[in-house]
Amino acid sequence: MNNPSTPSARRKARRFTLQALYQWQLAGAAVSDIEAQFLANQDFAKVDREYFHDLLHGVLGQVKTLDEQLTPYLDRRVEELSQVEKAILRLGAFELKERQDVPYRVVINEGIELAKVFGAEDSFKYVNGVLDKLARQLRYAEASERRPRD
């Protein structure tokens, strides 16, 4: 049996969270309805359910704040981002801000991987750049200690 706190279980939780955020952005359905739909999915068996719940509710509870934190690092308004990029960036911003137990490089890498799978051809580069800049702000000490000197 898969341990629900393994990296692959968390990766799956992020993937489902991205899909749930995308659905919420497009349809505006109640988060409880969206969550119930995903929990009933047969493919959800090896997902870290608690992490999925925390990410989904955390992002949706802080959308405005997350968008405000992302804005200085965007080359366009949040509303002009593709729905996939918007969901990935919000998810990454939430993890950078609230999940100090997850190294910032893991957060950025997971965002890149989601963008490669679900985003447009080069959206992973954009996601990487935005989340890297945000990490320097939100996790200054962690990002500074691991960066080579210029």
UniProtKB/Swiss-Prot annotation:
Keywords: RNA-binding, Transcription, Transcription antitermination, Transcription regulation. Involved in transcription antitermination. Required for transcription of ribosomal RNA (rRNA) genes. Binds specifically to the boxA antiterminator sequence of the ribosomal RNA (rrn) operons. GO terms for cellular component: cytosol. It comes from Alcanivorax borkumensis (strain ATCC 700651 / DSM 11573 / NCIMB 13689 / SK2). It comes from the Bacteria. The gene is nusB. Pfam families: NusB. GO terms for biological process: DNA-templated transcription termination; transcription antitermination. Belongs to the NusB family. CDD domains: Terminator_NusB. The keyword Heme does not apply. This is Transcription antitermination protein NusB. One of its GO terms (molecular function) is RNA binding.
